[in-house]
Every structure is written in C-alpha cells, then in structure tokens.
Amino acid sequence: MSILKLVKGVLYGEGEHHEKPKKTHIVIIGAGLTGLLLAQGLRKLNARLEAEGQSAPFTFSIHERDESSFYRGGGFSLTIHWALQQLYDILPEELSARIFECVGNPDAIKNGQMGSFTFLNLRTGEPALKTTIPPGWKGARMSRVRFLQLLMTDLDIHYSHRLSQITFPTDNTVRAHFENGDQETGNLLIGADGANSVVRRFVYGAENSKNTQLPIRMLNCRSEYPLEELEACLRVDPHLFHAGDPVQDGYFMFAFLDMPPAGSKNGKAGVQLTISWPYESGYLGQEAPSDPPTELPEQLAWLKHMAKHWANPVHDLIYGMPDDSIVRVIRVQEWMPNDANRRPTDGRITTVGDAAHLMTSFRGENANHGVVDVAKLLALLAPSGNKPTDLREVPVPVSTDDA
C-alpha cells in the first residue's frame, strides 16, 4: 500500500461516507533539521486548508532521542542555496521572514555582500579558484543552532524518546515504541533521525543499513577570535571559503558563525574551522594511518602539525586557536538506499534527509537535499481540491521511497 492509498483510506474512508474527515496522525522520529522542517510544513499546510474552509487533515508528534535539543551540541553551520525557495515554500510566513536572522554575518547580507566561491591554495594563501556569486543569487550560510531554534518555534518536542521498535497494530496504523516505555501510534511514521537512523535499520535491516566509512578523517572546530585577527579572512570572503593542500593533501573550510554587534571594534567573532586528511599510511610521516586525537590538547597539536607549512590566513588561524575551542571528531560516511533489501511497510514508513541518503559534507549538500525531501513529501501529502494528490502524478524522490 502506498502513502497515497493510506492517506485516502484514513482521511476519506475509500468507499464509505464520513460526515467529518478523519485526521492522519504523523509520527516524526527525530527533531533535527528535517524533522522540525516537516512539522512546520504540516503546520503551514493545515493552516492553508483551514483558510480555504477545509478541515486540517494532519496531526503530528515529534520524538527526539536526546534529552534536549542541543544535548550533543547542535552542530556549527550549514548552507541553504539551491533549496532556498523550497525552504520558503515549506515554512510558515512568520518563520520564513526570519531565515536571514540565522546567517553567520548578517551585516554582509544587509550590505548586499553575497560573497564568492573561493578555494585557496594552502601553500601560497592565494586563490586557486575564485568565482563571484552572480547577481540575484540567493543563499544563506547559517548558524545551525540559530536555525534549529527558529524551526522549533511553537513546536512541542518529546525528548528522551529513543526508538526501540516499530509495530503495526492495525491495517492502517503504525506504532513507535521507545526505550523509556512510551509509545506513539499514528498512520504514518517518518524517519528523520539522521545518519544512524533507527527507522532505516528497521526498514532495511541492521546489515543493509550500515554506513560506509570513507578513508578520510575530519575535525570540526568552533573558535572565537578578536575581529581584528579575522580581517584577512573577511577580505577573502565575508561568509566562508575553502582551501586545499596540493603537496600533502588535506582540506580546510572556514565559515563565520557569529559576529559581534555592528560597529564593534573590540568584539569577538565565532568561526568554524573544518580540517580533513586522507586516512593512509605514511601521511605526514606517520607509519600508520592517522586517526584524529580524542583530547583537546592533542587535537590542537595535530592541527598545528598539519598546518606547519600552510600560508596565511589559515596558518595563523590554526596556530592561534584558543584553548577553549570546541573540537569534534566527524565521521565521514555515506549510505545509499537499495530497495532490493527493503522490507514492505504498506506505505506507513518512509525516511527523509540523512536517514534516507547519507552523504559526505564536502559539497555542503546534505541540508539542501533534506529540505527538498520534506518539500516533496509535503507535496505528496497535500490534498488537491477535495482529495489527496495522486502520488503517481508526482515525481517521487529516493527518500520518499514508500510512496
């Protein structure tokens, strides 16, 4: 059974007369970007239908495994570019109007400085590639924490709900069981639970849902610097830039996360530094492949070792990293769906975002694909006139694989 048939059956009873349409309850597993975005999209869809004189067809609940939204930090930054219009389409107007409050350097945006795509040679400090952003291009390099806070507006999130099992009590319901003993029954269950998705594991099995670890290691850092120490970075780009080492291999990314108040000359700016290297024998003279250290002093020492022959501005950034920097080890992984390994769920379960198609962060596409997943899923769920849209007439993305 497809999502379409299930929604028709729940909302309209297919073949039966109902004085009041039933509501479809959607159980959202995961309160990250895609889970919150789906919830906001359902809010907007309900409001639109009510404004048209129809009953709001959807209810939903959000279930997060952690005990708070930022229990594990919330991440650093993300870029929405080719999916920006879909983001506007999904969000209620009062939230879409505030998207650019979440950017790392809001004054640059206000001044029309959309930036460039710049890739530096780490040995010379000069651009190996610099492409100016064309006029009219829209995109937002956002603080992930601020963006998630925006998406949480007016949402009720059930925390400490770590999914343990999924069952099917009736022909048109699905039930989520949580480790704390709680349960939630709905008509659709959407797995928005990230890279190590429990929903994906249920649908594809433990072995077929394993991520592939790539031969790359990465450290993601958040540091604060006096603004005057970042003037060279601002000259490269007011938002972010990338860089690579053509001699020893290695990748670097810089992004502004938080800027001091406008006009401040003594304030500090929060920035993101991302560094990765190949996991191979002999790298930087190490006999064995180099895993990232787990303790901060050793992590900072390793980064300085990598940056020894790098040019400014990156050299001084690395050597000047404060001792209170936040450094996280990032697993560079991917997962591709294979429907040959998929168990049938009668249209009651699907996945979005990293749960559906985990990819590496180097192209910065994860968030954009997650936004488009949600937009397409909402299009599949939205009624057309007095009946749901026929999913057979809508292009189905990989992630809405149960459509």
From Swiss-Prot:
Q: Keyword set for this entry?
A: FAD, Flavoprotein, Monooxygenase, Oxidoreductase
UniProt entry tagged with the keyword RNA-binding: no
Q: InterPro entries per the record?
A: FAD/NAD-bd_sf
Looking up Gene3D superfamilies in the UniProt record yields: FAD/NAD(P)-binding domain (3.50.50.60)
Binding of FAD, residues:
G75, R144, D354, A367
SUPFAM superfamilies listed in its UniProt record: FAD/NAD(P)-binding domain
Induction (free text): Expression is positively regulated by the azaterrilone A cluster-specific transcription factor tazR.
Entry annotated with the keyword Oxidoreductase: yes
Cofactor(s) recorded in Swiss-Prot or TrEMBL: FAD
Q: According to the UniProt record, what class of enzyme is this?
A: oxidoreductase
Pathway assignment:
Secondary metabolite biosynthesis
Enzyme Commission code: 1.-.-.-
From the Swiss-Prot or TrEMBL record, what is one GO molecular function term?
monooxygenase activity
Role description: FAD-dependent monooxygenase; part of the gene cluster that mediates the biosynthesis of azaterrilone A and other azaphilones, a class of fungal metabolites characterized by a highly oxygenated pyrano-quinone bicyclic core and exhibiting a broad range of bioactivities. The first step of the pathway begins with the non-reducing polyketide synthase tazA that assembles one acetyl-CoA starter unit, five malonyl-CoA units, and catalyzes a series of Claisen condensations, methylation, PT-mediated cyclization, and finally releases the first hexaketide precursor through the R-domain.
The entry assigns this protein to a family as follows: Belongs to the paxM FAD-dependent monooxygenase family.
Q: Which PANTHER family would you find in this protein's record?
A: FAD-BINDING DOMAIN-CONTAINING PROTEIN-RELATED, MONOOXYGENASE, FAD-BINDING
Q: What is this protein called?
A: FAD-dependent monooxygenase tazP
Which species is this UniProt entry from?
Answer: Aspergillus terreus (strain NIH 2624 / FGSC A1156)
